[in-house]
């Protein structure tokens, strides 16, 4: 019970006779045990709930959440308790609902046989002060192949390695606060993303002139099997990322955002096989900004349904960069912002929407083949 005067319960060993539970197992705050040992013989449940996202559980002694024999959950796992440090489900293979964990004390997170999550997979370690938390340094879900919903892993402040070696298809990927010390990010088999794919570093802006994003990740292991990202593919704020993944198999994007990839040595961005397709209510946009520099951006010649925003020297007035060579002949909307001393030359012929060029004083731009701006 959650009542203030409820009798405390510290031992659930008597429940070891249970093999299946059709409904939900709900752990109330009157339970003061350190683990769930009495549930270790259960193979199937409707769901497991310890707290909610809006009302965290206050079981002050519960440190380990494990059900060692559990193979199948027909509903959700929801664990929202900042005391939980260890998570272990040795035999769990499928979750027909969501898996949601919120704990700022996480030290280990083990799902060695999990293959399928029908809805969302969402792990966060945000502290009560709103800062990234947890002591866990490595997260690897070795057999996971499909997440129908959102895959989110965020605010794990000490994470060094994040690996999903067999993941092939996902509803969306939301890694929106990748830790600054992360060194390994591995998604080698990922092929289909039915929404957005966000790889965004945590970011600390000290003042107007200095800032810190992830300063360890030099290469993303994988994404070379990507064929479809129906939403926007975003890679952002990785200070020492040396190269982009090989996207030679990529056929469809809803949009592309590359932001503040300051040391990326790739100079040619080849998107020649990519069809940009509207996703939900969003029209396709290619946005390459804040010091992310390419000498050539190769696309299909007809980009009349796509907008593009380029700002290759967008860092605090920098004049260092390269004006990219563009091969398309038509574009929907085109915006270019640069402080570089050279005057760019654009060879495209038609802009079907708006064209905006932002340059410093006494700086120009040339578009000798431009026929019309509608």
Residue ranges and their predicted role:
Residues 1-8, 22-34, 44-63, 74-85, ...:
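Concave beta-strand-loop units of leucine-rich repeat
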Residues 10-17, 34-40, 65-69, 87-91, ...:
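Recurring C-terminal helix/loop segment of individual leucine-rich repeat
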Residues 269-273:
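Extracellular/mature segments of secreted proteins
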């Amino acid at each position: 019970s959650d009542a203030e005067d409820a009798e405390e319960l510290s031992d659930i060993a008597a429940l070891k006779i249970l093999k299946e539970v059709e409904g939900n197992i709900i752990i109330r705050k009157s339970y003061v045990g350190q683990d769930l040992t009495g549930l270790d013989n259960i193979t199937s449940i409707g769901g497991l709930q310890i707290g909610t996202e809006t009302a965290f559980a206050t079981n002050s002694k519960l440190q380990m959440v494990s059900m060692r024999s559990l193979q199948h959950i027909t509903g959700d796992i929801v664990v929202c308790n900042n005391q939980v440090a260890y998570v272990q489900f040795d035999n769990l293979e499928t979750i027909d609902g969501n898996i949601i964990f919120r704990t700022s004390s996480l030290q280990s997170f083990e799902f060695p046989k999990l293959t399928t999550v029908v809805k969302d997979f969402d792990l966060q370690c945000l502290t009560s002060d709103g800062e990234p938390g947890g002591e866990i340094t490595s997260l690897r879900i070795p057999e996971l192949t499909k997440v129908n919903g959102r895959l989110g892993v965020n605010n794990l402040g000490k994470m060094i390695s994040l690996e999903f070696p067999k993941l092939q298809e996902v509803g969306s990927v939301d890694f929106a606060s990748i830790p600054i010390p992360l060194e390994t990010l591995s998604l080698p088999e990922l092929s289909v993303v039915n929404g957005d794919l966000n790889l965004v570093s945590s970011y600390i802006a000290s003042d107007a002139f200095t800032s810190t994003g992830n300063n360890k990740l030099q290469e993303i292991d994988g994404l070379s099997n990507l064929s479809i990202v129906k939403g926007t593919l975003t890679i952002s704020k990785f200070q020492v990322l040396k190269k982009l993944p090989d996207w030679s198999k990529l056929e469809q994007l809803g949009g592309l955002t590359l932001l503040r990839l300051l040391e990326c040595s790739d100079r040619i961005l080849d998107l020649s096989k990519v069809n940009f397709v509207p996703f939900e209510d969003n029209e396709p946009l290619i946005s390459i900004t804040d010091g992310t520099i390419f000498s050539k951006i190769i696309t299909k010649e007809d980009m009349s349904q796509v907008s593009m925003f380029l700002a290759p020297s967008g860092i605090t007035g920098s004049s260092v960069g390269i004006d990219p060579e563009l091969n398309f002949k038509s574009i929907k909307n085109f915006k270019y912002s640069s402080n570089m001393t050279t005057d760019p030359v654009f060879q495209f012929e038609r802009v079907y929407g708006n064209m905006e060029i932002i340059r410093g004083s006494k700086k120009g731009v040339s578009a000798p083949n431009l026929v019309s701006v509608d």
